[in-house]
């Protein structure tokens, strides 16, 4: 992503993800806020997931981890990521080359980075100076 879109990619060594010809799923010019009508997308790998800045989801994706912990079994195998301006933390499920679900699971002020402990539990670092642990709500 850049000025119009945010994206999540499945990384393949040597893969061409279209930077700076593409923003998300849209062709773009060298001006970061300008879309173009078309571009050469030969050999480019499309994002696994993308969202536009104009759809209200946010404007700055913060990459995370695939959840492999034991405390939040409902998230097992989901890719956890955040969006900085919206404070949303989401769980993205991608299977059979398609997004199966993308659910907001938490809100963290100014998410800056993710971390993972030796048990696979995920933590979120905030620009507010705190580290947040993801925990199940009572009864879940």
Predicted regions, residues:
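Conserved blade-ending motifs and adjacent loop-strand segments that build the rim/top face
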Residues: 61, 98-118
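Blade-level signature of beta-propeller repeat domains, shared across WD40, Kelch, NHL, RCC1
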Residues: 113-140
């Amino acid at each position: 992503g850049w000025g119009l879109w945010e994206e999540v990619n499945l990384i393949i060594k040597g893969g061409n993800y279209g930077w700076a010809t593409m923003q998300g799923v849209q062709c773009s010019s060298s001006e970061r806020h300008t879309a173009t009508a078309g571009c050469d997308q030969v050999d480019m790998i499309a994002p696994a997931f993308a969202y536009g800045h104009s759809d209200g989801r946010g404007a700055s994706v913060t990459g995370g981890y695939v959840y492999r912990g034991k405390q939040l079994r409902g998230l097992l195998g989901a890719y956890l990521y955040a969006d900085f301006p919206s404070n949303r933390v989401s769980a993205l499920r991608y299977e059979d080359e398609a997004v199966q679900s993308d659910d907001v699971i938490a809100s963290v002020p100014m998410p800056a980075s993710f971390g993972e402990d030796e048990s696979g539990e995920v933590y979120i670092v905030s620009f507010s100076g705190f580290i947040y642990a993801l925990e199940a709500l009572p009864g879940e």
